[in-house]
Regions:
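Secretory-pathway lumenal glyco-enzymes, predominantly type II signal-anchor Golgi glycosyltransferases
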Residues: 1-324
Length: 324
């Protein structure tokens, strides 16, 4: 009697097919894992985490990289001990959407440290955020701090051929001085600057409040911008050095007047204004076209302002929290 070889042969074929199928599945899985790891590796090298030593910060907003981008430095003048205010403002500006076609760097500016706790805590902030500029001056409001800020910028950010590493020239088209009780809407700021000249420019909220003529007096210290060439002029000219004591915003207007500078002046009213309450000639209701809201001296005023502009609209749903 012949052995039944057809059944064994059929079993062998099925077994071989199963082995081949298993190998194909394993190969496909390995390929997927490899692709995932490769993508992860690319992500890790293309988007390194921010370093505390970087010149940009968590409060840096960039969109696009062409030569037409607007580069703005916002210097928020504050004091070394204002830790809570700085952390709060990092939230405010760090969660705003990037303005298309613009690069905005937000820095906190104050004078020399004077206490041991400042030397530790401010150093930790710099290591973590890299968004602090410490000027070589004694802390003050109207005794030369703003002059030191503007005149120091060309040395801090040389740009172009003067920079040790490749960088745009000028490093910023506009530099801004802002108060720490001012809320800035960055995208609206960029859109207001986009059609304007990038040299010999002075932009802000004209003082006195009823005035609409930017050539008569000066711009409010709530937040004003000058073009980079004017910061260089402030550094080099003798005019500011002879007139440094007094209200800083008024002094800047006098420097530019005496130096016959800032031929391009633009009034930011009424997109820049004081908080609606108490009502004065400098206030009006909050509105969507806002560039700056000033005199946010209390948390209640900040919250009312942030609620109006719906700053949490991009909060994503998650099982980790429930916010009504």
């Amino acid at each position: 009697m012949k052995p039944n070889t057809s059944g064994g042969r059929r079993y062998l074929i099925v077994f071989c097919f199963a082995v081949i199928l298993s190998l194909c599945v394993l190969a496909a899985i390995n390929e997927l894992e490899f692709d995932s790891l490769k993508k992860l590796g690319k992500c890790a090298f293309s988007n390194p985490p921010p370093s505390g030593n970087s010149s940009t910060t968590n409060a840096t907003f960039a969109a696009g990289g062409d030569d037409d981008e607007i580069r703005i430095l916002i210097g928020i003048l504050t004091r070394p001990d204002s830790y809570d205010k700085r952390h709060f403002l990092r939230l405010i500006y760090g969660t705003q959407s990037p303005a298309p076609g613009a690069r905005i760097d937000v820095k906190f500016v104050f004078c020399n440290l004077t206490k041991d706790d400042q030397r530790v805590l401010v150093a930790l902030e710099i290591m973590r955020y890299g968004d602090i500029i410490i000027l070589d001056c004694k802390e003050n409001m109207d005794n030369g701090k703003t002059y030191t800020y503007f005149s120091t910028l060309p040395e801090l950010f040389p740009g172009g051929d003067s920079s040790p590493s490749p960088s745009p020239s000028p490093p910023y088209h506009y530099v801004m001085k802002a108060d720490d009780d001012t809320y800035l809407r960055l995208e609206n700021l960029v859109e207001s600057l986009r059609p304007l000249p990038r040299k010999d420019l002075y932009f802000g909220y004209v003082i006195p409040c009823p005035s609409m003529d930017p050539f008569v007096h000066y711009m409010s210290g709530m937040g004003y911008l000058i073009s980079w060439d004017l910061a260089e002029w402030i550094r080099d000219s003798e005019i500011p050095k002879k007139n440094m004591v007094g209200p800083e915003d008024k002094l800047l207007g006098e420097w530019l007047r005496d130096g016959r500078r800032a031929k391009n002046r633009f009034n930011g009213k009424w997109s820049m204004y004081n908080f609606p309450e108490p009502a004065t000639q400098c206030t009006h209701e909050l509105w969507p076209e806002t560039i700056a809201v000033h005199l946010l001296k209390t948390q209640e005023k900040w919250i009312r302002t942030l609620e109006y502009f719906n700053v949490t609209v991009n909060l994503k749903p998650s099982k980790l929290y429930h916010i009504p």
